[in-house]
Structures are given as C-alpha cells and as structure tokens.
C-alpha cells in the first residue's frame, strides 16, 4: 500500500497537525514501533520538517529491560532519530505496579520534554476500550469514562495520542507489511493485571460478538469527554470566584452550592492543581472531616502525596513533606544553602531581600532549623512578647507553612524566620547587617 493511501499514516499526519518538534514515548513494543516508523515516514517520504526524539523509560521491572533499551537505541540509530533513555524507580505501594510505572514514566517524560516539543504516545482504539472498561469497573463518572483524549495539555505543551482511532489489528498489520521488528513483553501475558485480563479474556469475547465494540466504546468515551468539557465551561467562572492567588477554595461560598455542584467544583479544583481525581467517598470525607470540622481543629485528609488542609475557612491542597523539626543545618553564609524537601535555596544577597538582620559575631555559629515552639518571643515591629503560635496567627501563616519556613539561629538564639520576621536579638541597628534571600521552589 502506498503511504498516501495508508489510513494509519494519514491519521498520524492529521493528529500531528502543525507540530514539528516531537518527543515520542518509545518502549519498543509493536504500538510505539509503528508510531515511530510512521513519524519517520512522514519526515522522510512526506518531507515534513519533523524533529524527532524518542525516549525509552527503563522501569527496572523486567530482567530483559537492558536488552530492550539496546533494541530501541539501535532502531533509533538506524532511523536517524535522537534517542534518550531514563532509568526510574517504580513505587507500587499506593496504586499498584501498573499505576506506579505509569507515574514514573510520565515523570520522565516531563523531565525531558522541551518547551517547543509535544509528547506523542502510542495508545490505540483497543487501549481506549480497555481504559473505559477499567473506569467502569471503578464506578467512575463521565470524567473517568472519557478515558484518554487524543490531545490534552501537558507541561508547557501538549500530549498527543494519534493512534486512538486505529485498532490493534491495523497496527499489527502495518508492522508485518513493513517488516518491522518489535519487543514482546512477557508481562503482557500475566492476567493478574487488570488490563491484561481484559485484553486476553474479555475483549476477544466482546469483539467476537460485536466486531465494532471498541469503536463504539471510543465513541461513548468521546461523548463523555464532551459532557465534561461542557461542565468545565459552565463552571469555570464560578470556580475562579472560589479560588484565590494561592489556589485555595472559599468554604463559605462552596457551602452555598448543592452537593452535586460542590463535588463538581471540588473535582475541577483538583484538576486545576494537576492532582489525581478524588473518588466520590473521598469528596464526602473531605467535606465532612475537613471543611466542616470544629472551628478550633486543624483537620487534614491525605490524597496520595498531598493532603487537603483548612485554614481561615479556606481549603488548601498541599504536598505531604518529611518532618523537619529535628533538623539542624550548619550554614557558612559564604555559599548558598540548598534546603531539604525541595524548599528552595537560602543565600546572602547584596541586592534585595525581605530579611535584613545583624551579621553574626565571630564566635556565633549560624544554623538553619525548622519548627518554632517558643513560649515567649519578641520580634521587630511588636511591642510585647508573644508566643510563637500567637505570632504565626497574627502574621496569617497557615499551620503547615510554619514548619517549612527556615529559621536562622546564631548559636542557640533565634535571629529570624526568613521572609517573615526578625527577632529583637537579630535586629540590625548600628551593627553590620546582612540580607537573606529565600528562593523558594
């Protein structure tokens, strides 16, 4: 078949559109091999000005993964495609191995995707049907049932799935016609994994009974996606009224909504923060245990690597971090200090900064600590001594932020909470002063 009459090539060309800088997720399996071959054909035979880079993610889950990496690198060399490989650690504790591998893979994609590139992956129509059925098994709503969009925002660009209208049968036929070689992952035959069970046992029966089943499911997924897009459009203005510059939600305004509308807004809040979608039961717990908790409580509810917190009648979605209250970090001041937990960098600045304090004396050792619990404290700008809790409250510092603000000590004397306050002991009067800048991540 001539390339110009090939439905698969034409579909890739249509979906790629005007994008020319492309990062291809390449596992060496038949799907991604066909996708990459199709893009190479568009570059070489259609003369499209495509700049192709393939990335192989080594999950470390299969003893053959090193051989697969070599296979992919060899193919890219022959096809004159730039090649990247990345080894990742898979965390399967929370969502299982499949989800952990996917999260690690897409994190690698984020790491290497350039601002002018789009990410292209090889999911096809049968994958879409399997994703729909898995979402149905979980009891998902329209958002989950919409499955995988052909195009979606990803980092600063887009993620494209140009094979979603192409069947597995078409892909394999193309591979055989063009004499392509690909990797067969033996784990794909392990029906302990839900997706493999569907592909090996359920989909063949459904397709035998209804040959166009995958196509029909893909159409239903698209309709669910359209409904979600319409809801996004209708609720966007109201969501913007609920959210402030810190991406927190106004509980008082949210409480005026019906439960159905409130849940829809909460889901869109999670999506806006690029977090995994909460379940219906999780949304109920969020509202009852966090939003409606007693006024003097400090409620929290964990969602994977984040947690929802409440402060001053607003909901915040914040990352869970390692406890730092026992850490004491020495700092010479002559070099920038990289803070733990990706909290940023401290540096002595000659230009500007919010924290100006006295310079340490020769016999004073400078350390950085976290978590202030002083019973009595006097700070610049306040006449009377106050407890640290009272000071945090007066400065409107949320409880979870209080243990993440770097505290500057000279020996065992608190000098400043960076970007927040300076103590009387650290006040720069007639003495030599320094300016500390915190470049938060």
UniProtKB/Swiss-Prot annotation:
Residues annotated as binding ATP: 27-32
Enzyme class: ligase
Notes concerning its domains: The N-terminal region contains the highly conserved SGGXDS motif, predicted to be a P-loop motif involved in ATP binding.
Main function: Ligates lysine onto the cytidine present at position 34 of the AUA codon-specific tRNA(Ile) that contains the anticodon CAU, in an ATP-dependent manner. Cytidine is converted to lysidine, thus changing the amino acid specificity of the tRNA from methionine to isoleucine.
Family of this protein: Belongs to the tRNA(Ile)-lysidine synthase family.
Record's GO cellular component terms: cytoplasm
Keywords from the UniProt entry: ATP-binding, Cytoplasm, Ligase, Nucleotide-binding, tRNA processing
Any coiled-coil regions, as ranges: none
Organism: Proteus mirabilis (strain HI4320)
Gene designation: tilS
Enzyme Commission code: 6.3.4.19
SMART domains assigned: TilS_C
UniProt lineage: Bacteria, Pseudomonadati, Pseudomonadota, Gammaproteobacteria, Enterobacterales
Pfam family, one: ATP_bind_3
Catalytic activities: cytidine(34) in tRNA(Ile2) + L-lysine + ATP = lysidine(34) in tRNA(Ile2) + AMP + diphosphate + H(+)
InterPro entries the UniProt entry points to: Lysidine-tRNA-synth_C, Rossmann-like_a/b/a_fold, TilS/TtcA_N, tRNA_Ile_lys_synt, tRNA_Ile_lys_synt_N, tRNA_Ile_lys_synt_subst-bd
Designated name of the protein: tRNA(Ile)-lysidine synthase
Keyword Ribonucleoprotein: no
Source organism superkingdom: Bacteria
A biological process term (GO) from this entry: tRNA modification
Subcellular localization(s) per the UniProt record: Cytoplasm
Keyword Chloroplast applies: no
GO molecular function, one term: tRNA(Ile)-lysidine synthase activity
């Amino acid at each position: 078949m001539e390339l110009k009459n090939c439905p698969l090539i034409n579909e890739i060309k249509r979906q790629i559109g005007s994008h020319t800088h492309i990062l291809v997720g390449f596992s060496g399996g038949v799907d991604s091999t066909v996708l990459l071959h199709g893009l190479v054909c568009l570059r070489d035979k259609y003369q499209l000005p495509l700049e192709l880079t393939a990335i192989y993610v080594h999950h470390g889950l299969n003893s053959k993964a090193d051989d697969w990496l070599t296979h992919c690198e060899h193919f890219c060399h022959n096809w004159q495609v730039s090649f990247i490989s990345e080894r990742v650690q898979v965390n399967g504790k929370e969502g299982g191995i499949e989800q952990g591998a996917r999260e690690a893979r897409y994190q690698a994609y984020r790491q290497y995707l350039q601002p002018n590139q789009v990410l292209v992956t090889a999911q096809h129509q049968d994958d879409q049907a399997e994703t729909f059925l898995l979402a149905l098994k979980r009891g998902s709503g329209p958002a989950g049932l919409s499955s995988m969009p052909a195009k979606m925002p990803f980092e600063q660009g887009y993620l494209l799935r140009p094979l979603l209208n192409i069947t597995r049968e078409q892909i394999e036929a193309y591979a055989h016609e063009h004499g392509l070689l690909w990797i067969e992952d033996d784990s794909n035959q392990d029906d302990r994994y839900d997706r493999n069970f569907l592909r090996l046992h359920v989909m063949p029966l459904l397709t035998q009974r209804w040959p166009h089943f995958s196509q029909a499911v893909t159409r239903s997924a698209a309709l669910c996606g359209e409904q979600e897009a319409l809801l996004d459009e209708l609720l966007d203005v109201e969501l913007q009224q609920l959210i402030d510059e810190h991406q927190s939600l106004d509980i008082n305004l949210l409480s005026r909504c019906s439960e159905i509308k409130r849940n829809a807004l909460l889901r869109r809040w999670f999506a806006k923060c690029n977090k995994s979608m909460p379940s219906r039961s999780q949304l109920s717990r969020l509202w009852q245990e966090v939003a409606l908790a007693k006024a003097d409580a400090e409620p929290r509810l964990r969602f994977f690597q984040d947690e929802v917190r409440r402060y001053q009648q607003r909901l915040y979605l914040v990352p869970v971090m390692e406890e730092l209250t026992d850490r004491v970090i020495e700092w010479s001041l002559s070099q920038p200090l990289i803070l733990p937990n990706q909290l940023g960098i401290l540096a002595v600045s000659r230009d500007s900064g919010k924290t100006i304090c006295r310079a340490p004396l020769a016999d004073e050792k400078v350390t950085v600590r976290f978590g202030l619990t002083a019973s009595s404290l006097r700070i610049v700008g306040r006449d009377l001594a106050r407890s640290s809790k009272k000071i945090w409250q007066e400065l409107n510092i949320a409880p979870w932020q209080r243990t993440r603000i770097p505290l500057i000590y000279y020996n065992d004397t608190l000098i400043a909470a960076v970007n927040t306050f300076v103590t009387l002991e650290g006040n720069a009067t007639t003495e030599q002063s320094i300016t500390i800048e915190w470049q938060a991540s």
